[in-house]
Amino acid sequence: MKLPAAIDEVGDYLADVTALEAAGAAALWIDDGSLDPWVLLGAMAAVTHRIRLGCLLESGLWPPATLATLQKLSRGRTMVAVSDPGATSHRIFIAGPDQDAATGAIFEVQSADQLGAEAARDAHIEVWAAIEVPPDRAAWAEARTAYETAGATGVILPWNERVLDLLRNPEPDDRTDLLISTG
């Protein structure tokens, strides 16, 4: 999930972060926008326990001491994605013990077919696909399956309140198990 770096109400923002973690999101990403991404990721680390936290850097620079502190606060859940000027992808760096360290890339694609050979199935290579929010549950299930089959580690969706519902209720709307009989 790619969250906006702008915050209107901090309580609502952090509530969305915890709700996304509870709904099963694998990672939350923010841009290095107007707010300090490191402080924002530190706040997110304080209210979460499992979800990975990533920053999409356009500048290509990150302070090593700040990243080390954030890794400590997040218990090793921090990822950094760096964009090369003019590139259509971000390179990902995931710090941690040697067995957990990884690199990878984020690709902005229109379909899973575009990942092709980029989606290497090496345990230390992560491939994230930045996609649009699917229109419904069926499209969400289809997209997840297609990108997983293509070798993607996961998909990154822009923040949309509908995504929380997709994460919480990934199955189609057919809930015949909930029908009640009245006489």
Give the residues covered by each predicted segment.
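N-terminal glycine-rich cofactor-binding segment that shapes the pocket for flavin-like pterin cofactors
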Residues: 1-146, 150-154, 158-183
